[in-house]
Structures are given as C-alpha cells and as structure tokens.
Amino acid sequence: MKRSVDARQRELKVHLTVLTDDEGRPIPKDAPIPLYEPPVFQDVHNANRKAIIIGAGPAGLFAALTLIEHGIQPIIYERGKEVSERKKDIALLNRNEGLNPESNYCFGEGGAGTFSDGKLFSRSKKRGNMQRVMELFHYFGAPDTVLYEAHAHIGSDKLPGIIKRMRECILEHGGEIHFESRIDSLRELKVESLKFKDSPIILAIGHSAHDTYRMLAAEGVALETKGFAMGVRIEHPQSLINKLMYRGLTSNSSPKGKESNLIDFVGNASYSLVTQVDGRGVYSFCMCPGGHIVPAGSAAKSCVVNGMSASHRNSPYANSGMVVQINPEDIPGDDPLRGLLFQEELERLAFEHGKAPYIAPAQRMKDFVEGKESKDLPACSFLPGIIPSRLDQWLPAHIGKRLQQGFRDFDRKHPGFLTNEAVILGVESRSSSAVRIVRDPETMESVSTPGLYPCGEGAGYAGGITSSALDGIHAALQVITSQPLL
C-alpha cells in the first residue's frame, strides 16, 4: 500500500496503491487483517550471548531490537543523554545559552535524526526490506502514514517519544543502555570486563563523532576517505515554494478556497533539485517544508546548520540544504581523515564570519549569486540569529561557484526560485560522513579488527534514518549468524 503526490503539472495527481481481494475489490480499512507481523522480543536478561553496541542512533537501536528478537543481550553505550534530557540541552543551544559537546543535535539517544526532521525516506532501492523498518517505527508509535506515504515523515516533535518507547522495550527485555558513556578506546572496552571480553562490537556511531574516528585511526582500525557533500542551508517563504511547486497555486491567500484546501490535503510543498556543475553534483538535501533551521554543531568555535520540521510542517518557512559533491580526489593528501579535517576547517571559518557564540553568517540568495553585500536580511527561523556575511567571498571557490551556478539552473527550472526573499546560511557540512570504516562486504566485519561490525551513517554505509536503521539490522543479523567467540 502506497500513497504519493505528483504536483509537477497544474492538475495535481494522487497515486494510490491499494490492497484488494481476489476479485479486485479494495479491502476496507477496518477489515480484521493485520498490517504486518509484529515483532516478538525474547527475555535476554540471562542470555548466554551478548553483543556490545556503540551508539544509540537508528543503527544502534534497530541492531539492539534485532538482537533481542534472536535471544542475544545488547549492551549499548551512548555518549549523549537520554532523549528528554537531551531536549533540555538543545533548548539551551537554541537560546544561544551554550553548547554541550556530548548532548546536542548530533549526539544523544536517537541520533542526529531525532531532532532534525524525522524523515523516513531513502533514495536507495538496493538496501533491502525498508518496509520492515517502517513497521517497527509504527509498532513503537509512529502514525499509520509511515506504512504507505512515499515520503514518510514523523517530525521532530513526535520522534523522541517513539525513541523512548524503543529504549523501554530494550530495557524491559533485558538489554542494557549506558548513557553519557563515550567510548575512548576499543582495546580498553574489550578488556574492561570478562563478560565483554569475547563479545562482538557493533559500531553504530554517527557521522559527527570526529573524536571517535581519530581514536579508531590511532588503534589501527582500517579507514578510508569517502565522497561527501558540503554547502549551505537555504530558506524561502513557504508560500513562495508552494506557488512554485504547485504550479501557480498559493497556500493561504484564500482560506476557504481551493488553494487552502489543497495545502490541507497534500501539505506544504517540498522540492528535490539536482544539477551538474563542472563535473560535480549540486543538489538539495534534507528539504524541510514548514520547518526551521537549527544549530547542528558539536564542537566549540564551529558553526554548522541543519533543518528540521515538526509533524504538522506548518511554519511559514521552507528550508533545505544546498550542497556540492566532494570527491576524495578534491582534497589533497592521503590521510583517510582529510575529508573530516576539511569539514572542520570550513565550520571554523563559518564561526569566524558569524558572531559568537552561534549566530550564523548569512546572505540573501540573489546577492550571493551576483556577488553583492546584503545590507539587511529577511526574517529567518534560525533561533540563535543570523548576521550579514559575504559567503560568496569566503566559501571555497569549488563550492561557492558551483552553488551560484546551481542556483541559476534551479531558477531556470522553477522561475522565481532565485530571489532575495530567500536567505542562505553557512555552513551545511554534516550531510554525510567523510570517512568510511572499511568492512567486508559479505560479513560486515571490519577488515582490520575481528569482532568489530561498523554500520550506519557514521561508518559510511548509510544516509538518513531508514537506511541507517536497516544497516543496523543487517549488522545484528551478521552477529547472530556468526559463531560466538568463546
């Protein structure tokens, strides 16, 4: 069962895939037919087999749930706080009252996606049973729409409660979760306790765990640079995006008219844009209709932005990352962490061009393309605040010039997209991991470190909540089928 909206033409179309009986008649919604087979979790309090999981993001949580289904006790170490305490630290950051480097938009229970929109969508068609991921989210409280919407979305206001219920399930069935427990050495973890000595480790860190990458490199774990993307986050008035994407229809100009009814039915418009500039992709990333821009850094003296939407997606702003593809050969050297170092360099540069502590540098979109100073800035959803800055001058040329041409290309496709009503903020640098923890393609085990199973976005094998969750499931299944190390 699937529902998708095609708004490419003036006549909007809704595509439905429905479940029917043998004679082709749609099955009623209230028919006594289960939507899916619910999970069956075992009691693992006294399980003989244990597995350590580092990270309580989607990869780590779904790995833990899978282990419990198969009678293995998961022991999770999470550097950040549980979700309700994490929410308090994020509120302080939004008010410009300080950054907790261990509890923020990147670190803590649920991972980065918990407070950055909650999209349940993956572009990949080759990763496996995504539907099972959706079913588990639904089992723990996600709305029915996650089972059939083509671009399912939970929202940053709803996802924390779902994550909490996952945690409660893990603990109820005998798993362990240790918060505020950053792992600073794999070697020390393996010898910390006899009960852990022979346990496999599922490494499910997020892409912002730069200190963990450095620890892994120092301990001889095989790493390599991978392609990633960096750029800016852009924000338009949502009413303008509705007009452009719904072919001339507007959102709230007539509360009782067809435009308002349309938005009520299909929601605020989103977009997915891509072009090629000088051999590199330029594209929108994590588009958040009716959303907000948020401070997504995890280190002092750095400025990182991201986007999020609540479940109703009803703010007056539409934001999206606008990023440029960066290949390993674009960064000189052979250090596997050189992409990470480039990220950090640009984040520090954005901080220097903003205003301490976390006010972001910003420029009107058309001024950026035309190389002009923005004398003032439009209203913006970024709570810490924005300050005028010449992003066109200080962004690296291979990023800035491609973004300028990319914006022109997008305006040709959607006339009116390039406008000074829109504002760009720097920098969007955490769209994906710049490092890959090298693993065997069949067993998912580290090629250098027996018993280590890297997975998820931080390992460089996923991008987003659903693909990370599925990779965590796959890693757990590999642990389950492997012979226990005795």
Q: Predicted regions: what is each one?
A:
Residues M1-F115, K119-L486:
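Residues forming the flavin
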